[in-house]
């Protein structure tokens, strides 16, 4: 394991690793313990009591955070005709079909999210092996395979984030930047936590949310006690 820098070590001293903090305290600490010289991302991590190996315990979806993520997402839309015009009018960064499939096959990835109309998925499927490992493959569960391209582009630009449980039963998702006001980070966290609760698989047994923490890009993890706030 790489040796932690002096700033990180000093920041970590501010955190009691045995304690689960009030959510407001936790967010305050995230800002205090940030050691990056840039506007670092604040991330929430949820350790869940699910078995991702079982299809009925997979968790995947997307949610629009009330205060956005602080990052401008570059959107590529695969669509034709009127739907292509709709995507352009909505502010998509790139709109096309076979031309962009060829570019991606040649190693072009100057985008963050792909939206595709259902009739284009046969073509998009040709680059599935390239997109899949990068988490870029459009999926109906995240609202990125749809004929409602205007809505999809608008939501992504407004701060929509995708979430997916990993092989270890964890979900990691950005909830903003350290430059955000604490209240806005708390609101985003609450929205994400509420979304995770509602996504609980019926087949999940025992304790569902085992651990919750927040951290900045180069800061220490801070445990959160979700019972310290009410999620509507």
Curated annotation (Swiss-Prot):
Signal peptide: none annotated. Pfam families: Ribosomal_L1. GO terms for cellular component: large ribosomal subunit. CDD domains: Ribosomal_L1. Keywords: Repressor, Ribonucleoprotein, Ribosomal protein, RNA-binding, rRNA-binding, Translation regulation, tRNA-binding. One of its GO terms (biological process) is regulation of translation. It comes from the Bacteria. SUPFAM superfamilies: Ribosomal protein L1 (SSF56808). GO terms for molecular function: rRNA binding; structural constituent of ribosome; tRNA binding. The keyword Transport does not apply. InterPro entries: Ribosom_uL1_bac-type (IPR005878), Ribosomal_uL1 (IPR002143), Ribosomal_uL1-like (IPR023674), Ribosomal_uL1/biogenesis (IPR028364), Ribosomal_uL1_3-a/b-sand (IPR016095), Ribosomal_uL1_CS (IPR023673). Part of the 50S ribosomal subunit. HAMAP family: Ribosomal_uL1_B. Binds directly to 23S rRNA. The L1 stalk is quite mobile in the ribosome, and is involved in E site tRNA release. Belongs to the universal ribosomal protein uL1 family. This is Large ribosomal subunit protein uL1. It comes from Bacillus licheniformis (strain ATCC 14580 / DSM 13 / JCM 2505 / CCUG 7422 / NBRC 12200 / NCIMB 9375 / NCTC 10341 / NRRL NRS-1264 / Gibson 46). The lineage of its organism: Bacteria, Bacillati, Bacillota, Bacilli, Bacillales.
């Amino acid at each position: 394991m790489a040796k932690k820098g002096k700033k990180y070590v000093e920041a970590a001293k501010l955190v009691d690793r045995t304690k689960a903090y009030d959510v407001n305290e936790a967010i305050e600490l995230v800002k205090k313990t940030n050691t990056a010289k840039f506007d670092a991302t604040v991330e929430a991590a949820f350790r869940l009591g699910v078995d991702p190996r079982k299809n009925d315990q997979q968790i995947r979806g997307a949610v629009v955070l009330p205060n956005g993520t602080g990052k401008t997402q570059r959107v590529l839309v695969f669509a034709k005709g009127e739907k292509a015009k709709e995507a352009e009018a909505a502010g998509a960064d790139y709109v096309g079909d076979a031309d962009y499939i060829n570019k991606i096959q040649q190693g072009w990835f100057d985008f963050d999210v792909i939206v595709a109309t259902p009739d284009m998925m046969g073509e998009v499927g040709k680059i599935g092996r390239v997109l899949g490992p990068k988490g870029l493959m459009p999926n109906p569960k995240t609202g990125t395979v749809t004929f409602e391209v205007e809505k999809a582009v608008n939501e992504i630009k407004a701060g929509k984030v995708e979430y997916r449980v990993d092989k270890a039963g964890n979900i990691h998702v950005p909830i903003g930047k350290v430059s955000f006001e604490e209240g806005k980070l708390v609101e985003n966290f609450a929205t994400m936590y509420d979304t995770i609760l509602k996504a609980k698989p019926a087949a999940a047994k025992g304790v569902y949310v085992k651990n919750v923490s927040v951290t900045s890009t180069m800061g220490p993890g801070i445990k959160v006690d979700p019972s310290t706030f009410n999620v509507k």
